[in-house]
Amino acid sequence: MIYTDNHLKEKILQMMDASESEVVEFKEARSNYSFNDIGKYFSALSNEANLRGLQEAWLVFGISDDKQIVGTEYRKQGGLQSLKKEIVGSTNERLTFLEIYELTMEKCRIIAFQIPPAIRGIPTTWQGAAYAREHESICPLPMNKVDLIRSQIGMDWSKEIVEEATIDDLDSEAISRARELFSKRQNDRKKHKKFCKNYQI
């Protein structure tokens, strides 16, 4: 989802008002911030979003741990959007930020990094290691969380039965095509049986 400035400001205020969340991290980052730490938070927040079935997680610069808007000078001279390409080089599956937003709140510059969830069945790694949130910090992704994410790969939703579904929910062209293929398959089987019988195979 792409946010407008006003929509994102409302969302940030909601996140600030909410209790502690494993998919949101606020950092002052008044001037600079470690690129390696950004990568670790990317991995951790991406994995936590996956485990909670969410479409995004957030790393927000310019807001203190006690949720005061203080502003940030991080990459103010340029290079902010190039961070998308820089992150790709050290994540698996070439994951990067969904979007990087730069906005003003209370006359202060704020940067909001929109992070995607880990791909189903594959924990997001940074430089080969997968991370998770642990209270106010990050830690290696625990094995139980690794197993939870990896177990998703075995789910085949196409085999699931939708109890409420009716024939009206199916595409008419797809039904016609399926009938044609089924009919052809049955005819091929009959021909094969006849062939085997004639030649006593």
Residues covered by each model-derived region:
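Conserved N-terminal catalytic/coupling substructures associated with nucleotide/phosphate chemistry
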Residues: 1-201
